[in-house]
Amino acid sequence: MTSKDLKGTKIDNIDMEKNFPKLNLFTMFRLGFYQMGLGTMSVLTLGVLNRVMIAELKIPATIVAITLSLYQFMAPARVWFGQMSDTKPLLGKHRTGYMWIGAVFFTVTAFFAVQAMWQVGDSLRVNGWSNSTYFWIGILGLMFIFYGLALSASSTPFAALLVDISDEDNRSKVVGIVWSMLMVGIIIGAITSSFLLKQVGVDAPLETVQVSINNLFIIIPAIVLVFAFIGTVGIEEKYSRYGSRSTIANREDQVTMGTTLKILKANRQTGLFFTFVFVLIISLFMQDAVLEPYAGEIFLMPISESTRLNAVSGIGTLIGLGTTGFLVVPRLGKKNSLKVGCVATTISFILIVMSGFTGKLSLFLSALFLYGLAAGLTTTAALSLMLDLTAAETAGTFIGAWGLAQAMARGLSTVIGGVTLDVGRRLFNVSMLAYGLVFLLAGVGMILSIFLLNRVNVREFQDNASVAIATILEGELD
């Protein structure tokens, strides 16, 4: 097959695409149920477990951060799962089979991770830093590794599905609605978690905490699994254009992982955007590992109240996601909108530190709301830019690459946040200064992201991508 053949095939497939129905608003919101479930699960892992392990079980923040971040470090599997969903259908579908099976595994694994967490706490309390404690820490880490693999298997094909079922004229609407639903999930998760944990006070007995957390990790994952099925059933069969857009969709015996990596490396802009996303996500989410402990230690919030902080920032993010695509990006453009988001995020970090020094809870909550707005602006602009840098020919592959950058950065941000907090405690021996160091480092990273963004060129990517893919496939598929 020559590059000329590939181009000819694409032209022939244009008429086929006309036969697919357009997504309506109801379907877009239905797709959002899947993302809503992911948002709810994120509250359980970073909004609840980190608080319990650090504050209630007295596990060092560095160990907690490393353990919780392990699921993010399974991100290289995203490229593999993306490539697999491009080339090897599962349960008869390119995307849906991976999404459903992955959802079953990550919801079930979350509950087993909690049980391993209790064993770590019990062993540490009874035996100290013994072989038994290290064993259970290893088991806990293994649970999060499985969780990360299952999450990658499910979420990467879902993101690729969004490319498959949308066109240029409605893709921004799909992204805006679906990612807004992600924030709705975070808000729902925060409020629901707070309600289910309302009887758990600051000095509640560990047995009470354990029963409440176990119930939480039974009820919420079950709901998330239902959301995953409701949000995606029948979508791929009715709306996916992948088979008509891609010449490799049915050539699973010939398209290898090596071919996939060559496609990714063929364009200079791929590496530049990967680096930008990596630094941006680290800086944006470094505070995740320390925010709830910060609220508990500096403002003396119980678990039920600190968990609700996700709702405060989540509402801001939801507003940012829902309005940026209509009010900001059309006027400023994607790159300038990203720069504004980075600056606003830095300001929010400064205000969070000021609130701690002054002890003003109202300033803290206002800063969190501003952080949410800035995160919504940044996310909308970054996702729109990401779709401009995704070739429909190999959507799963490129989505996997961007997912790799995002997930690895999220994992590393958790580690950096926890380690920086511990380093700050040793350097200053004052909790407020230690937490302030984390937020300061995050702000510096946001400014660095602006400089990296200036090197990203969408037009260069688009000019080179089609030719590079056709050339590589010509050599690999013949």
Task: Please tell me what each predicted stretch does.
Residues T87-F105, V329-V343, V430:
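Cytoplasmic membrane-interface "Motif A"-like loop-to-helix N-cap segments
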Residues G47-I63, A289-S306:
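Short amphipathic helix-loop junctions that connect adjacent transmembrane helices
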Residues A61-T62, I137, E168-I177, I303-S304, ...:
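Loop-to-transmembrane helix entry/capping segments in MFS-fold secondary transporters
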Residues P76-G92, G320-N336, L421:
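Helix-to-loop junctions at the C-terminal end of transmembrane segments
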